Amino acid sequence: MSGVPLRVFRAAWVLPVAAPPLRDGAVLVGADGRIAAVGPRLSIEPPEGAEVVELGEAALIPGLVNVHAHPELALFRGGLEDLRFRDWILRLVGAKRAALTDADYDVAARWAMVESLRAGITTLAATEMSGASAGALREAGMRGIVFRETFGPDPAQAEDSVAELRTAVEALRRGESELVRVGISPHAPYTVSDRLFAAAAEYALAEGLPVAVHAAESAAEDHLVIRGDGDFAPGLRARGIQTPARGRSTVEMLDRLGVLRTRPLLIHCVRLDADDVLRLADAGAAVAHCPVANARLGHGVAPFPELREAGVRVGLGTDSVGSNNRTDLLEEARVASILHRAGRRSPDYLPAEELLRLCTLDGARALGLEDRIGSLEPGKDADLCAVSLAAPHARPVHDPLAALFHAARGTDVVLAAVRGRILYRDGRVLTLDAAALGEAVDAAAARLGGHLR
């Protein structure tokens, strides 16, 4: 990468993750987009010709890492409220088929990038069928992985589904770059047959593709996988698809089918037992923890403490705005802290410094990117986020970490940068036309609305 000016970012607080917080700190970014130095403001003299970016009463942190989102579903915010999970999915799928075009997905994905940048998210793992996020990430200048979904609950569909997946992935990979990668996502146990899971895993291993799977998310999924009944079973049987009682959990099933050999990112993982947790740890799998969406859909709370204690890589995800309504990783971290403190009956579980790690370096580890991003260290890419702590709801600041996660909001973000390139500053996304996108979103949503009831 070239063309990025030398920059010194200065802020009232610099929170490197890999080192203690710095009062009146600075980060020097080289022309290669990498961090050259981190230290007290007075110790970093701007090189000749360097641009100095003064951030004032802000906390400068690594760019936030959202390990699970559905950007193509940005038009569904507020349109799928108070539904049972099966009905939520059926209404979502029906509306997509009836109302949305490829152009709508392009608009939705770009709108999701606008929201993400405004919330300080610089890296995003997108799980979707359209693949629209690949172009949206590139245009926005963000970093990410696009997990292209595949579906097929009928075993007879497996070969055709894999062939279609290969074609789509090959097209997406032609646009890969240092910042944007492509993976695959056999969607979930209620939409993917055993045969398709196994074939997708073999394909991923052969091609070196990262894998993401929605897994152990709901009681309905549990009932289908273990007992062969529950909310999903009647619809599958009506299509002539058998729903055998496996007598094993989703994690056991994925292990038996070879999916865990891919060291996948498993999304949600609410319904795990102790054996499942150990199995994930042994396999080197990662988990996308989505506390807000899991709670709003009534699924419950993932066993995050047990996963961490077992050594499983866990990052935070916002899921779609159809299930969460907001793409705010600071809020996601705060909710995670509240839920798990309540569950553990412990007022000091997940302190603010661990929340910072959870939505930066831990997220990078979950996506296999920890050698490049997730902390402010010389040699790493300068993916940055600055959060103002000057608003009344954040002051006074006795502890910048506590202020960041227990008082500040995603709307307090004042800067987002990737490899030193500023993508968002003081209310304005610099790489996308937010005003035009907003008008396009409203027009598409008006057409979609009639299909959501």
Feature-to-residue mapping (PLM):
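Active-site microenvironment of metallo-dependent hydrolases
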Residues: 1-25, 30-36, 357-453
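Divalent metal-coordination and catalytic microenvironments
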Residues: 12, 27, 33, 57, ...
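Active-site beta-loop-alpha junctions enriched in small/polar residues
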Residues: 70, 129, 149-153, 185-189, ...
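Histidine/acidic residue-rich metal-binding segments in metalloenzymes
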Residues: 135-136, 162-286, 298-314, 371
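Active-site gating loops and adjacent loop-to-helix segments of metal-dependent hydrolytic enzymes
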Residues: 75-107, 114-117, 141, 145-154, ...
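His/Asp/Glu-enriched, well-ordered alpha-helical/loop segment
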Residues: 256-259, 263, 302-391, 407-408
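Alpha-helical scaffold segments that flank or form the walls of functional sites
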Residues: 59, 77-141, 163-177, 440-451
